[in-house]
Amino acid sequence: MLDHSDEIHPLFHGAPKTTEFRKLRKRLVRQTRDAIERYGMIEKDARWLVCLSGGKDSYTLLAVLYELKWRGLLPVELLACNLDQGQPGFPATVLPEFLKKMEVPHRVEYQDTYSIVMDKVPQGRTLCALCSRLRRGHLYRIAREEGCSAVVLGHHRDDILETFFMNLFHGGRLATMPPKLVNEEGDLFVYRPLAHVSEADCDRFSTAMGYPIIPCDLCGSQDGLQRQQVKAILEGWEKNSPGRRQVMFKALMNTRPSHLLDTALFDFAGLARK
């Protein structure tokens, strides 16, 4: 690991010199690299649109990708992107100033999706679905305009687990957000390189680095969201049985269609005795 500030990317200037932080940084790099390689995210001459919301997860994503690129382990071009959605009180200057200071190529765009969401969604209903759909549409458009082949998101292991249980409890299906997919139009990849990284590690890293975290008041102000309920359940399981989250995550990589009930995945009718 490089220790001198003139030998590392500006995103890591001022990094703690503690053994604990070095282990955390090494773990983040290893887990992210493993996910990138495992799910085949690297294309020749690729350009990635790295989405930056200002939350702890997206800061971690940006820093770790630049760490990999700095080491010569990520041969792609990176363009950071923040979509200012017009939320009241959003500190519009924080991210542009941060990215300029960190010498990170970026694009910041203002689109007032907040007003659309508040106008279209009945009072008391969850805002997240429409907000996410509008944001995704703009990010895809920006990626095309910038000549990017992939939109890169900061979802981590815990997001993936929570989505799995939301689909299980409320959607009646076994599914979650995949680490890699192709959009409906078929012209862009969507990557989640932090798929193997825990939320706790993202929090520890961004806090230790002192990045200017921007809270999502639009989502966080809503009580009783399904995701928050599932998060509380998972936290309870983890407290009673430490390591439970990682065991469940491993299960998502170790499915056995023959031991489930989906006839689209396994031909039960075609089973024959010898």
Swiss-Prot record:
NCBIfam families per record: PRK10696.1
HAMAP family for this protein: TtcA
Assembly information from the UniProt record: Homodimer.
Keywords: 4Fe-4S, ATP-binding, Cytoplasm, Iron, Iron-sulfur, Magnesium, Metal-binding, Nucleotide-binding, RNA-binding, Transferase, tRNA processing, tRNA-binding
Family according to the record: Belongs to the TtcA family.
Pathway stated in the Swiss-Prot or TrEMBL entry: tRNA modification
SUPFAM superfamilies named in the record: Adenine nucleotide alpha hydrolases-like
Coiled-coil region list: none
Miscellaneous field: The thiolation reaction likely consists of two steps: a first activation step by ATP to form an adenylated intermediate of the target base of tRNA, and a second nucleophilic substitution step of the sulfur (S) atom supplied by the hydrosulfide attached to the Fe-S cluster.
Motif (PP-loop motif): 53-58
EC number, UniProt record: 2.8.1.-
EC primary class: transferase
Segments passing through the bilayer: none
Binding, [4Fe-4S] cluster: C128, C131, C219
Gene Ontology biological-process annotations: tRNA thio-modification
GO terms for MF: 4 iron, 4 sulfur cluster binding; ATP binding; magnesium ion binding; sulfurtransferase activity; tRNA binding
GO CC term, one of those recorded: cytoplasm
Annotated localization: Cytoplasm
Cofactor note: Binds 1 [4Fe-4S] cluster per subunit. The cluster is chelated by three Cys residues, the fourth Fe has a free coordination site that may bind a sulfur atom transferred from the persulfide of IscS.
Task performed by this protein: Catalyzes the ATP-dependent 2-thiolation of cytidine in position 32 of tRNA, to form 2-thiocytidine (s(2)C32). The sulfur atoms are provided by the cysteine/cysteine desulfurase (IscS) system.
Designated name of the protein: tRNA-cytidine(32) 2-sulfurtransferase
Biological source species: Roseobacter denitrificans (strain ATCC 33942 / OCh 114)
Known cofactor(s): Mg(2+); [4Fe-4S] cluster
